[in-house]
């Protein structure tokens, strides 16, 4: 007997349809699994055998061969247990092949026949829909993800027996109701910019960063509020669109980080890895590449606190994602490209002791130590950070004032308006904020005569690079958008230059 069943696995952050071919023939009892299965897939033989027996279904004591096509793709995860079991029952005439057409089965089997949760179900359902499947059967624990994709019927099953009885017509299951992804997009944050005392320049810089998707470095002594400000950056970003929310949810589903209570990621990611992180954990890696922190921060914020404490080689890996908005990882088994459009927010002290330039504490570092500390961050990486600002100590009068600062909601309103202007301008290019390339800078960041004179004077005075020139123009374009100005004026350019050059080597 021969049967073909549709299943799904993941490759990178995308789903891939797998054709599970099951052949049961005469011969000595054996169970061969071919088609480049990973260890978790090879172990499915024992899980499937026990699940069938404990669900009171016969397991064929003959020669069994299971092929997972395409054979050149490595099959990861345990989600192929269910289609293998369905294929064996089809060969045993428990299920009719005609009733399995255009149906996809995803799930890990426990030894007692229950169907366990698997990672990456959202990507698999999206791929199943793209491949023309009409129905998908997933574990009950993955129901939240199954509600998100429209245009395909998604069923949840708790046990193997429940699935078989449904396919036999003895017990009818109903497909999951579809969920409007953005219906509950009213995120209440536990932190707010209103809590921040003083630091008006930093607040302004973070507003510009949020409006234009610009990277920012904050330099200041310990306790001046760098981390506090960075953690509030995500609260002033615009709400995610449906496409952005699905993309982020897909990434978090793949790596198994999707919150239990949430069906979809509506809050923009905020990732803050420790400075001891390895390059593979930051960018992604493994024998079969998996997403790293730069991808987990996609459409959100990547906060690197104590920037010079990171390994220099690790920081240098940020060059490609900062420039291209994606990261390419090549391994012997596979080459993957992951999305990584994030706002880099970095913070550091001005020197090893932290008090260089402080108005109260005296710096105890030698000049050689300060120079060595600054050299930990390379010039090419610094050149890719749009805004670099100094933070001063918060005065006692600012700290004790009863006046609350401007709230995150008020700042977010201005950010959203600026983003709408950028969306209208860049919609044809598939961009949604001012993270433009060279050709877009030339087209959309033109200067009048007065602004051109300001740019030329500071370009020569500060020995700026061509990249610095373009990044200043992009920040100036965002400042103009926040001001509701169609053109970049000299005042917008002057502010952009100040925010770019206040931290000098």
What feature does the model see in each segment?
Residues 59-62, 99-100, 130-132, 150, ...:
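Short loop/turn elements that form and flank the Walker-type P-loop nucleotide-binding site
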Residues 1-217, 221-224, 265, 468-469, ...:
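Peripheral, non-AAA+ core regions of ATP-driven protein-machinery
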Residues 207, 264, 269, 279-302, ...:
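Conserved alpha-helical scaffold flanking the Walker A/P-loop in AAA+ ATPase domains
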Residues 218-259:
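Walker A/P-loop
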Residues 299, 305-306, 317:
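Walker B catalytic acidic pair
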Residues 40-45, 60, 67-77, 289, ...:
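Basic, amphipathic alpha-helical bundle interface domains used for macromolecular binding and assembly
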Residues 244-278, 285-286, 392, 432-440, ...:
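Conserved inter-motif catalytic segment of the P-loop NTP-binding fold
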Residues 220, 284, 306:
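The Walker A (P-loop) glycine that initiates the GxxxxGKT/S ATP-binding motif of P-loop NTPases
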């Amino acid at each position: 007997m021969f049967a073909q069943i549709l299943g799904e696995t993941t490759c990178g952050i995308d789903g891939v349809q797998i054709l599970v071919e099951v052949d049961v023939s005469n011969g000595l009892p054996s169970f061969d699994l071919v088609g480049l299965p990973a260890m978790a897939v090879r172990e499915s033989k024992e899980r499937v055998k026990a699940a069938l027996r404990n669900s009171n279904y016969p397991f064929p004591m003959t020669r069994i061969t299971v092929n997972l096509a395409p054979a050149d793709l490595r099959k990861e995860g345990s989600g192929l247990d269910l289609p293998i079991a369905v294929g064996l029952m089809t060969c045993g005439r428990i299920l009719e092949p005609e009733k399995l057409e255009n149906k996809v089965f995803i799930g890990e089997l426990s030894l007692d026949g229950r169907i366990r949760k698997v990672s990456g179900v959202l990507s698999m359902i999206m791929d199943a829909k793209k491949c023309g499947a009409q129905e998908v059967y997933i574990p009950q624990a993955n129901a939240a993800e199954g509600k998100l994709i429209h245009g395909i019927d998604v069923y949840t099953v708790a046990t193997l027996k429940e699935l078989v009885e449904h396919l036999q017509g003895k017990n009818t299951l109903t497909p999951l109701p579809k969920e409007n992804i953005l219906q509950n997009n009213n995120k209440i944050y536990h932190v707010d910019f209103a809590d921040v005392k003083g630091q008006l320049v930093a607040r302004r810089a973070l507003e510009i960063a949020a409006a234009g998707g610009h990277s920012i470095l904050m330099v200041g002594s310990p306790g001046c509020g760098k981390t506090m400000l960075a953690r509030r950056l995500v609260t002033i970003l615009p709400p995610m669109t449906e496409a952005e929310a699905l993309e982020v949810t897909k990434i978090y589903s793949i790596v198994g980080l999707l919150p239990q209570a949430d069906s979809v990621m509506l809050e923009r990611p905020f990732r803050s890895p420790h400075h001891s992180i390895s390059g593979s954990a930051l960018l992604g890696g493994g024998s079969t590449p998996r997403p790293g922190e730069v991808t987990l921060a996609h459409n959100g914020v990547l906060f690197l606190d104590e920037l010079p404490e990171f390994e220099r080689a690790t920081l240098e890996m940020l060059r490609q994602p900062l420039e291209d908005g994606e990261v390419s990882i090549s391994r012997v088994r596979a080459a993957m490209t992951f999305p990584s459009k994030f706002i880099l927010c970095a913070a550091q002290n001005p020197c090893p002791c932290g008090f260089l330039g402080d108005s109260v504490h005296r710096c105890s570092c030698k000049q050689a130590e300060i120079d060595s500390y600054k050299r930990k961050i390379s010039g090419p990486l610094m050149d890719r950070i749009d805004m670099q600002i100094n933070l001063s100590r918060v005065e006692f009068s600012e700290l004790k004032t009863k006046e609350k600062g401007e709230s995150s909601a008020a700042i977010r309103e201005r950010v959203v308006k600026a983003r709408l202007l950028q969306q209208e301008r860049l919609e044809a290019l598939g961009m949604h904020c001012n993270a433009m390339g060279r050709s877009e800078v030339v087209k959309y960041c033109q200067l009048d005569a007065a602004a051109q004179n300001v740019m030329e004077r500071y370009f020569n005075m500060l020995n700026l690079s061509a990249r610095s020139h373009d990044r200043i123009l992009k920040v100036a374009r965002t400042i103009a958008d926040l001001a509701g100005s169609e053109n970049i004026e000299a005042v917008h350019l002057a502010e952009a230059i100040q925010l770019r050059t206040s931290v000098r080597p």
